[in-house]
Amino acid sequence: MIGYIKDAIQSGLYQDFWGEDSLLVDGFHECYGEQLTCEGFSAYPSSTDDNVVYVDIGGDSVHRFKITIEGV
């Protein structure tokens, strides 16, 4: 199930990014004062941990976020 959740998170992030009123684009501009472009955004699964999705935001100065999915 974790694989499906990871796929949904990645898909949702990309859908928001390409959407007309993107929370990611607005948030990036508000936090960093820059325009987020397609070259500056990536969401991908970890190559070493099946429960992790990484999100890289920002061109040259990448801000990396780690999303960990755990069952309870």
Description of each model-found segment:
Residues 71-72:
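Short acidic DE-rich linear segments
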